[in-house]
Curated annotation (Swiss-Prot):
One Pfam family matching this protein: QueF
Kinase listed as a keyword: no
GO biological process, one term: queuosine biosynthetic process
Organism annotation: Bacillus subtilis (strain 168)
The keyword Cytoplasm is assigned to this record: yes
Cellular component, GO, one term: cytosol
Name of protein: NADPH-dependent 7-cyano-7-deazaguanine reductase
Amino acid sequence: MTTRKESELEGVTLLGNQGTNYLFEYAPDVLESFPNKHVNRDYFVKFNCPEFTSLCPKTGQPDFATIYISYIPDEKMVESKSLKLYLFSFRNHGDFHEDCMNIIMNDLIELMDPRYIEVWGKFTPRGGISIDPYTNYGKPGTKYEKMAEYRMMNHDLYPETIDNR
């Protein structure tokens, strides 16, 4: 039994679709959203994405990361299968780690207009160096803007606790 009306699921086309088309080039249009039924409260939604891959824009070598996406929804939420396919579309996309995290965040802001969002990539080392770009956003003029500033300043106070290596 569902509490969702069929009209609330109209934009959700990928979930349950047995003929899924896996895209190998960056494809922001694959992202889908659905209405948040709980706009009266703040709550976090967190996605752990341990199989993210992209390509180095200079060498074409693959980069691997675990990406953490956390957000406080407003009116819309991202549908998880569409997010999976969207992240998969970075497989042959050549960009620096920092660019990938900002692109992902910007696309999700455009899709959902969340109250708050953060995207953190923990990339596996290449050449003995790991890169962990963190980016966030809080809706301007709201308490979430202040929250974003606070979390930015405090997001990685204890780097020795990072254990994805």
